[in-house]
Curated annotation (Swiss-Prot):
Species, as recorded: Yersinia pestis
Chain segments annotated as coiled-coil in the UniProt record: none
Positions of Mg(2+) binding: D8, D103
Descriptive protein name: DNA polymerase IV
Family membership noted in the UniProt record: Belongs to the DNA polymerase type-Y family.
Annotated NCBIfam families: PRK02406.1
Co-factor binding details: Binds 2 magnesium ions per subunit.
Annotated PANTHER family: DNA POLYMERASE KAPPA, DNA REPAIR POLYMERASE UMUC / TRANSFERASE FAMILY MEMBER
Family annotation (Gene3D superfamilies): 3.30.70.270, 3.40.1170.60, 5' to 3' exonuclease, C-terminal subdomain (1.10.150.20), DNA polymerase, Y-family, little finger domain (3.30.1490.100)
Gene: dinB
UniProtKB keywords: Cytoplasm, DNA damage, DNA repair, DNA replication, DNA-binding, DNA-directed DNA polymerase, Magnesium, Metal-binding, Mutator protein, Nucleotidyltransferase, Transferase
């Protein structure tokens, strides 16, 4: 069996700010966009979470829950510097590191000789090193598969770790809510519940054929995770699959001309970002997102070989007139999906 560690920093952005300014340590603190500009919360410290402040929450709502909240815009350079140091600590134990974001990563320590080969002790040492070298805390989950390692990292937060051994997998899964499986949101959970399926234990008694009938390919994922099967490898060279930019507006817009001007502005930023990862600007798809004042949204995409502003404007124009239904627009976003590297190489050969 493999030995997988999932390391998750504790309220990372806020923790960096509290470390660098101890006056922030015991007060409700959040990182995010201002309520005047209709921003959202990126992360919140534990004093703020006690008031119900959560990541991805509109900043205005956060202030309603916690009027005394201290809000900071964030310092991405500081967070990236800390993240790089953390990555260097991981590399002392294994080259098999799959970063998921600045503040979390999977590690495969199956072949590591450190700490006598004990994944539990390796996780403990990593957390101790992060604490002593960066004055930050991390939580960790240790399990034979990625799915359970990630769940385990949530069970002893903050500044703790949890181990699921091979012998503990089945007992652990029996009562595990299906909502813990990635991809099971509120809608899917409701459909599962209608079938009498609430826990992984319920799925274990349910025919795979029925799951496939009701949920298609995702039915197999549900069945496998509920049986403790997750064959996904750690991917050290995890490839970026998309690039996007978006802007939340200070006031809703109701006229196409304002949206068009914003898309012109966002396009320049998207092109700049894309050139950093794909100088040729070759892509697989490009698209537009509009979020309305009622928080519903529409995303429209076209298959397109190269980043193209005219096409993006046409997509946006169609979405504006077909999906808006006279609602105000509060957010506009542009994104591209990158080509699979093998496919891109083949296309270049074909074009050459």
């Amino acid at each position: 069996m493999r030995k997988i560690i999932h390391v998750d920093m504790d309220c990372f952005f806020a923790a960096v700010e509290m470390r660098d300014d101890p006056r922030l340590r015991d007060i409700p603190l959040a990182i995010g966009g201002s309520k005047e500009r209709r921003g959202v919360i990126s992360t919140a410290n534990y004093p703020a979470r006690r008031y119900g402040v959560r990541s991805a929450m509109p900043t205005a709502m956060a202030f309603k829950l916690c009027p005394q909240l201290t809000l900071l815009p964030g310092r991405m350079a500081a967070y990236k510097e800390a993240s790089q140091h953390i990555r260097e600590i991981f590399a002392r134990y294994t080259p098999l590191i799959e970063p998921l974001s600045l503040d979390e990563a999977y590690l495969d320590v199956s072949d590591s000789l450190a700490c006598g080969g004990s994944a539990t002790l390796i996780a403990q040492e990593i957390r101790q090193s992060i604490a002593s070298e960066l004055n930050l805390t991390a939580s960790a989950g240790i399990a034979p598969i990625k799915f359970l390692a990630k769940i385990a990292s949530e069970l002893n937060k903050p500044n703790g770790q949890y181990v699921i051994t091979p012998n503990q997998i089945q007992p652990f899964l029996q009562d595990l809510p299906l909502s813990k499986i990635p991809g099971v949101g509120a809608v899917t959970a409701k459909r599962l519940q209608a079938l009498g399926l609430v826990t992984c234990g319920d799925i274990q008694k349910y025919p795979l054929a029925e799951l496939l009938k009701h949920f298609g390919k995702f039915g197999r994922v549900l069945w496998e995770r509920s049986h403790g099967i997750d064959e996904r490898e750690i991917s050290p060279d995890r490839l970026r699959k998309s690039v996007g930019v978006e802007k939340t507006l200070a006031e809703d817009i109701y006229d196409w001309e304002s949206c068009e001007a914003l898309i012109e502005e966002l396009y320049l930023e998207l092109e700049t970002r894309l050139r950093k990862v794909k100088p040729s600007l070759h892509i697989a798809r490009q698209g537009v997102k509009l979020k309305f004042h009622d928080f519903q949204q529409t995303t429209q995409e076209h298959t397109w070989p190269v980043l193209n502003k005219v096409d993006l404007l046409e997509i946006a124009h169609a979405a504006w007139h077909e999906r808006r239904a006279e609602r105000g627009v509060r957010l506009v976003g542009l994104h591209v999906t990158l080509l699979d590297p093998q496919l891109e190489r083949q296309l270049l050969l074909d074009w050459g």
